[in-house]
A protein has these predicted regions:
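Short, solvent-exposed positions on alpha-helices
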Residues: 41, 62, 66, 140-148
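Amphipathic alpha-helical packing segments from all-alpha helical-bundle domains
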Residues: 93-136
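Short, amphipathic alpha-helix enriched in basic
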Residues: 1-13
């Protein structure tokens, strides 16, 4: 995460990562088939972390409008380091998501990756917020679009 943040995803290679962490390049390929798959993993981790916050922080709110307002606050607030996950710097990960995540779905393989579930957590976050919107205003026809716009 630190290296991708420092040099950008386009300049990032497993060879550079291996040098940085004192490992050989081939050992990294055991975990990730390509740097694109690493970006997909980091993206999924970020959206799962955000979903975790949504669930934990809105679970006990019974008023639908208050729940939606809290959800919007959660997905739009400034990201700070989460001590529950000391192995990840969420502030740097957020910067990577903002700057590089479009590269995870602007590929020829996007449909196949979608079928394989790579974007499932992201879609779940959108669905959660969409459902909160519909709980406030059931007749609103574009809740998925609005939810997507809010998190982007």
């Amino acid at each position: 995460i630190i290296l991708i943040n420092d040099i950008g995803f386009d300049n990032f290679t497993f060879k550079k990562l291996g040098t940085k962490i004192g490992s050989n390049e081939s050992s990294i390929y055991r975990y990730f088939e390509s740097k694109h798959k690493l970006l997909l993993y980091l993206s999924s981790w970020y959206w799962a972390w955000l979903e975790y916050q949504l669930v934990i922080e809105t679970f006990s709110i019974s008023n639908h409008l208050e729940k939606l307002e809290k959800a919007v606050t959660i997905v739009t607030r400034t990201v700070v380091e989460d001590n529950n996950f000391a192995h990840i710097d969420e502030t740097l990960l957020y910067k990577i998501i903002v700057n590089e995540s479009s590269k995870s779905f602007l590929t020829k393989e996007v449909d196949k990756e979608n079928e394989e579930g790579y974007f499932e957590v992201y879609k779940r976050v959108i669905t959660r917020i969409s459902e909160m919107i519909l709980n406030v205003k059931k007749e609103y026809s574009f809740s998925l679009s609005l939810a997507s716009t809010i998190i982007e």
